[in-house]
Amino acid sequence: YLDVMIIDFNKMVEELGSIETLKTDFFSNVSHEIKTPLAIIQNNAELLCMEKTPEKQKEYAEVIFQTTKRLSELISNILKLNKLEKQAITPVAEEYDLCGQLAECAVNYEPVWEKKDIGFDADMEDSVKITADAALMELVWNNLFSNAVKFTEPGGTIKLTEQSDDSEIRVSVEDNGCGMTEETRKHIFEKFYQGDTSHAMAGNGLGLALSLRVLQLNDYKIEVESEPGRGSKFTVIIPKR
């Protein structure tokens, strides 16, 4: 009887795995089909924003542009996540300066911080080398910065810290925003999970899931510290090899 139970259980696991694969493939196929017409809509909306058109029409065009931009980002993240989960991405590991990469990512967010009146502090070494896929790691830093901006109120501060010793490098992105409950922390790396529904329109719940897959691909770790009303701190741990 026990043998039959084990066989039935294994069969159920296989079926659930097949359902998950079908669901992921469906998302991927639909995303590919939507990508091209969405790009056309986005490009035309951008052109309308630049044309000499009445102010009200420009406002409508801007709404279309921003909405299609968010959808494009969602589709890109779905496709990347699908490839990572299927292990269809082979990381191209090369040695590069991590501090230089972090500085470049931070500079890209300067206009956003200024617009939202958010302070930024950085505490890093002059240079530290790692061997990894730079393009994939850039996704991680951009997602962490994007999250920090999203949940930090005007007048708040975001802090970037990089430290290293003989065994590992630790990179932290910390904000003093709304923070998270313990329940949210448990699920924060799950696909499409959004703990704070008041910020639902600002993201799609895929950024941290995507970041985790990239880090797992490199055998890196990520830790989260957070308290409601006191902000959040994400720390990526990169072992030295």
Show where each model-derived region lies:
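Short helix-loop "hinge" at the ATP-lid/N-box region of the Bergerat-fold HATPase_c
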Residues: 148-149
